[in-house]
Amino acid sequence: MATPKIVLTADRTLMSPYRGISLATFFGCAPAIDPNRDKNSFWYKILKNQVTPKVLFDFICNWSPDINGVAKYAPYGLRKVEAGLLRDGYARKDVVIAHPNHIEKFIGPETEVVGTYEMDPLGMGPVTMTFTFGRKQTSYDEFYNAELHHRINAAKKKNGSHAKVIAGASGTWQYNYAPEKIEEYGLYAILEGELGGIAPEIDGHAGRFFDYLIDGQFENMDPFRKRKDFKVDIKEYKRGDNTYHGRFVNFWDRP
């Protein structure tokens, strides 16, 4: 069976109803792993590197339902993009919001783009930074975002897909401060902007944005040219002896 051209998804922390407990949505900010825990300590003997027990987190952050792998519920931003693509001429069979637990089912040779919705992908939000002592520990937000990207890359390799992976939504600014993750996750582009990323900035331009992605028009787009659609910046980061690059896309619809 052919796979869709465009696959949209989000990690577990953004796809959970949290058992209907409103404040539980902050639970993703909780520390998951302490990589520096003393292996001779009492807590290491009980929990290993876990801080907040995973069994507790997974109970509260329960899975949202799916229908044959398609997410029944999804973040509003993803629904906006989905609706925009259908409005702009993409066929229903070519666009899917995949449940993160079934992402492998939808990535294949026909897949052109995988888009992820990210609010706190690297655990740099203010609440998360407080709970993790400034990222000395790994939050569940970061833990499950990393898991999602590793699964996407594994699915691409297994299924022979050359899909471009893009990240969007309000947390994409965090990649500026940990650019090594751009390389680790294999991100082709990062969609950022003042209003929160993947949906508001391309509202009314969803089809054009994905046409550009699929056609390769973001490869060498002139960042200094004022235009009525998108602006691309190729950023370079030095981290010790390593150099990283990131392709950042902004919606460019200003007077």
Task: Please provide the spans of the model-predicted regions.
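Conserved radical SAM core fold
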Residues: 120-134, 196-198, 203-207, 253-255
